[in-house]
Amino acid sequence: WPEMLDSVVAAEQPKNALDLGAGSAVLAIALAKLARIPVLASDIDPVATEVAAGNVRLNGVDDLVECVTATGFDHPVFADRGPFDLILANILAGPLIELASEMARNVKPGGSLILSGILDRQEDAVLEAYRAADFHYIRTLPREGWVTLHLKL
């Protein structure tokens, strides 16, 4: 993750990002510190969102990271804050596949996705779903049976 995030941020200079399925907001915090840009951190679990908000405060990026509880993209904040230059999602392959078309509606043309939480044997299915949603494959970063994907709209 850090290597992929560093290279995408350096190459693309995103201005507005989303961490979907943020959990404890580790990626949102890392991105806010790295790029000094606004990051929306969203999770389906309200307890995770509370923990994330605490972590954001502890890391001194509460001026940059906003935490919300939402199922997928079902929250008005996405219309207010999006579309995004960069979306990070570290969630399971099944939900990633289901969200492919919504990802396309919420990322700017030319914007990037960094997707992880994908077992290497699930990579082809995830790529198929995102290609069908008009994303272009950039690269895969494999690690111990898991993959992180970089895709662009």
Q: What are the residue ranges of the model-derived segments?
A:
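S-adenosylmethionine
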Residues: I44-L153
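Conserved SAM/SAH cofactor-binding pocket of Class I
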Residues: W1-G72
